[in-house]
């Protein structure tokens, strides 16, 4: 898990710990500002913060505007459906289906490019909740994040229906 709250409500995770170590080495003080996914780049543009450390993926459009760290991870996208949904076996099967997505994520673009009807939500939890509640047919998201969710919610009633062959890099912006 890259960013999450521990049992005491403290922000932690791989991204948090790496940024804290880098800041410590440079003698900087770190203040984390939690922001909805779709507002992260706007916050960077407005100089509300100096870096995005939340499993960000450089897209060609983003690389034109932002500097990124070297990738520290590569992850595939997955389509998550209800466990009893067998209608989605490939990315093209998303055509005409509702998919819960964060508006600005790379995975949202993949869902849209495959003909999904995008229902915009703010977070992975909302994506998966919308699938679980039957408000949407699927969500396309990062495999590692989904596997972490399944580890914490083994009886979620959801499944990974499809895994992408494409792996995208993750870094800090």
Tell me what each language-model feature is.
Residues 44, 63, 108-114, 151-152:
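Short loop/helix-cap segments at secondary-structure boundaries that form the rim of catalytic
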Residues 29-36, 101, 116-124, 130:
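Short beta-strand-to-loop elements that line the ligand-binding cleft
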Residues 18-19, 40-43, 107, 127-130, ...:
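Short, hydrophobic alpha-helical packing/hinge segments within bilobed ligand-binding/sensory domains
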Residues 27-29, 45-54, 97, 133-145, ...:
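Alpha-to-beta junction loops
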Residues 16, 20, 24, 29-93, ...:
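Acidic, polar ligand-binding/catalytic clefts
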Residues 1, 91-104:
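Short loop->beta-strand "edge-of-pocket" segments that line small-molecule binding or catalytic clefts
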Residues 73-81, 143, 147-173:
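Periplasmic-binding protein-like
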Residues 1-13:
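Short glycine-rich His-centered loop
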């Amino acid at each position: 898990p890259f960013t999450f709250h521990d049992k005491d409500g403290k922000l932690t995770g791989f991204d948090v710990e790496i940024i804290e170590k880098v800041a410590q080495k440079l003698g900087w003080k770190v203040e984390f500002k939690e922001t909805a996914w779709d507002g992260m780049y706007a916050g960077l543009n407005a100089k509300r913060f100096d870096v995005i450390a939340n499993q960000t993926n450089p897209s060609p459009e983003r690389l034109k505007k932002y500097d990124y760290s070297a990738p520290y991870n590569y992850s595939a996208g997955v389509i998550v459906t209800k466990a009893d949904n067998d209608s989605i076996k490939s990315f093209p099967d998303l055509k005409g289906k509702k998919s819960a997505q964060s508006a600005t994520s790379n995975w949202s673009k993949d869902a849209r490019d495959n003909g999904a009807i995008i229902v915009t939500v703010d977070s992975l939890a909302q994506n998966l909740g919308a699938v679980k509640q039957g408000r949407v047919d699927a969500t396309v998201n990062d495999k590692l994040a989904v596997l972490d969710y399944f580890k914490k919610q083994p009886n979620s009633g959801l499944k990974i229906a499809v895994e992408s062959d494409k792996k995208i890099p993750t870094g800090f912006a």
